[in-house]
């Protein structure tokens, strides 16, 4: 008989004697206390046959540390200090006390002062009371016997002094099951060809199926948390009647990435420390319609046909031909708006969610590449109020409420607004997006009618993902430090539901 089978028989016999076992940790098996791990295997096996029923319990107990054991046996440090001072008759200075008690002197002296057992007289320590009661060893002895005491304040003090430590103990209570018996019947787990041939299966007993048991996790691929949140955003946009823009073009010319957006060619964002420039090929010969390029050039230099004055600086075609890794998906939005103007304007709503690249220092909240969520609304005679109203609807779908809007600056939007929401857990206002109305200097050279207004807004995909999945460092979400277990275990997400 194996040890497991012997333990099963032992438990059944104990149950037969008493009908119930309230606490398995009080049992002794094979000459020692029955531990929870050892008992669990036998209990689960018997419960699967409905021979017993059980409940699992967990309690907290306190054990003495090595120092606690020493004090329990030999008395507290403060009592030793008091006794040495009493024995000296005239008191002791600190140096003499350390020679007699060693490390106990420093620990015990402070406690003895606190309890009012000793006082200072000149450079000596003298007793302050004729007698003391050393309660600490008594309390520790009670904890050693019972695992705890009723006085929570004293228990907290002992924990702070590192005389006791808390442990969790698991135990089981057992009752007889519907199939209780002292004989353990072996149940079949498989229906074999031999059993079918001999018809022995008709009288055989089989182990019941456990339909609540977890199956083996599928070995297939898993969606990254970013992709799950991305699909939630796409759903919101489609519900609001938006059309998705094609964004499968990571490389853009300086024209679409900057110039078409009315970003000055002298802007710091166009420096190598902020933008990734391609080496091979370093530039492109493919620019849009020369007339459009000429209108953009004139708008930059002197305002062109718009009412503005431009940047009053030369416009370099060499600069506009440079190839970069796109720094924002607004380059795609500009291309779509240009096509909208060429094909005959009609009210439109576009969105995109894709990767962009910035030459930034990588840290816990910044990466050199990340995902931008962007939306554009074009119609006649729409205003900043329409933008604010739409943003309240859009962020409301993500359960982000209580918005505030702060004036901001963007080269291609005016007016521009930063969007803030009050974060209940952080207890402060946090930025959740950026927005604005595209400038006439961007729209009119495209050929859009003068009464057409375009509203734009954007946010990162990573920030809401980090909040929803409780990720503090963005490098744990994207890059070589990503834990594959995080991806496999990440649940489905609903941005419109509170956690």
Curated annotation (Swiss-Prot):
Q: Which keywords, in A-to-Z order, does the entry hold? A: Aminoacyl-tRNA synthetase, ATP-binding, Cytoplasm, Ligase, Magnesium, Metal-binding, Nucleotide-binding, Protein biosynthesis
Q: Which positions does UniProt annotate for L-phenylalanine binding?
A: 330, 372-374, 412, 438
**One annotated GO molecular function:** magnesium ion binding
Q: Main location per UniProt?
A: cytoplasm
The record's section on Pfam families has: PheRS_DBD3 (PF18553), tRNA-synt_2d (PF01409)
InterPro entries annotated for this entry? aa-tRNA-synth_II (IPR006195), aa-tRNA-synth_II/BPL/LPL (IPR045864), Phe-tRNA-synth_IIc_asu (IPR004529), Phenylalanyl-tRNA_Synthase (IPR002319), PheRS_DBD3 (IPR040725)
Which Gene3D superfamilies does this entry report, sorted A to Z?
1.10.10.2320, 1.10.10.2330, 3.30.1370.240, Bira Bifunctional Protein, Domain 2
Q: Name one GO biological process term.
A: phenylalanyl-tRNA aminoacylation
**Stored CDD domains:** PheRS_alpha_core (cd00496)
Q: Where does Mg(2+) bind?
A: 414
Q: Tell me which cofactor or cofactors this protein depends on.
A: Mg(2+)
- PANTHER family annotated for this entry? PHENYLALANINE--TRNA LIGASE ALPHA SUBUNIT, PHENYLALANYL-TRNA SYNTHETASE
What is the similarity comment for this entry? Belongs to the class-II aminoacyl-tRNA synthetase family. Phe-tRNA synthetase alpha subunit type 2 subfamily.
Q: Which NCBIfam families does the record cross-reference, listed alphabetically?
A: pheS, PRK04172.1
* This protein's name: Phenylalanine--tRNA ligase alpha subunit
Write the lineage as a comma-separated list: Eukaryota, Fungi, Dikarya, Ascomycota, Taphrinomycotina
